[in-house]
Amino acid sequence: MTFDSANASKPLSVVLAGGGTAGHVSPLLAIADAIREKRPEAAILAVGTPSGMETRLVPAAGYELATIDRVPFPRRPSADLVKLPARLSGAVRQARRILEEARADVLVGVGGYVCTPMYLAARKLRIPIVIHEANMKAGLANRVGARFSNHVAVAFAGTRLRGARHVGMPMRRAISGLDRAVAAPAARAALGLDAQRPALIVTGGSSGALSINRAITAALPALAAAGVQTLHITGNGKAVKDDDGGLLTADGYRQVEYVDGMENVYAAADVLLARAGAGTVSEVAAVGVPAVFVPLPIGNGEQALNAAPLVAAGGAVMVDDKDLSPEWLRSELIPLLTDRSRLNEMARKSEALGIRNADQRMADLVLEAVSA
């Protein structure tokens, strides 16, 4: 089969690969939206796994989703390592079939389990590959894919990938276009927060963070005494209970398991306390939210690396998970929450580092790859 992007008899065909977590799916969808805005006639297909968040998020955004088998790469010798060649070969065949049926002009990968077989299949078919790496420390799939691509983009300036261009993190327009000052009153009303009291919003991500939950709940009396109101996004199935097994309640404290639309959170918060996933760090910087980051203490340390530039610039504070305690919250967080001058300075420094138009930059890179 011959792939000819100059063929005017068919619209541009773009295949975007990635998934497993919202950290992969959100930028993928932002890139898709920006491509559709620039090229409304484009045929856009997303590729993910059968069990990731993409199975819900991609169709909800109005895009078609194809799936291939999930092929994790074992990090140490195991039975899975022995099975890897056969599994990878099968996934590459699936990927090739998808690309051929889509008559793809370009493959865009954002990382995750599906990307390695998609990159390998696209290389065999001589389809241009465009890569976006979200984390400061590049994942394995994108390190492999970067060897086959002349169009590599990164969210963080310090990410080490061959030939990488710093474009920022593609994000939803509701976030990238957010004016916090204008949106704050409506956002606070929507989240059940008082319009005047300092607001701390706490989240551990979609799966929650037990260590954060414990520290915050133990510090609630001190937070309330300082006049601080707390919205606690606990994570699905992670509701905080009291000693009698009921939902914990306290003065100035409200908990929810999930918030649909982080733009309201960013607009309403005086301080956000959160993990340091690449998406969260990038969104916080783009819209200028003062933040306290508690990097996930497992994995390859990528969350601390994600947050480091923003912390160094003075736009955020970072505390190790092991050091997050009620005492730290009383001695460090409460003085921050009640210091309006410092919060304004953090917001200014944060926004100066952020990038709001990464989706447009990525769409331009995709179109550049097609025309190269």
Swiss-Prot record:
Its EC number is 2.4.1.227. One of its GO terms (cellular component) is plasma membrane. One of its GO terms (molecular function) is undecaprenyldiphospho-muramoylpentapeptide beta-N-acetylglucosaminyltransferase activity. UDP-N-acetyl-alpha-D-glucosamine binds at T21, A22, G23, N135, R172, S206, Q303. It comes from the Bacteria. Gene3D superfamilies: Glycogen Phosphorylase B. It is found in: Cell membrane. CDD domains: GT28_MurG (cd03785). One of its GO terms (biological process) is regulation of cell shape. Belongs to the glycosyltransferase 28 family. MurG subfamily. This is UDP-N-acetylglucosamine--N-acetylmuramyl-(pentapeptide) pyrophosphoryl-undecaprenol N-acetylglucosamine transferase. It comes from Paenarthrobacter aurescens (strain TC1). The lineage of its organism: Bacteria, Bacillati, Actinomycetota, Actinomycetes, Micrococcales.
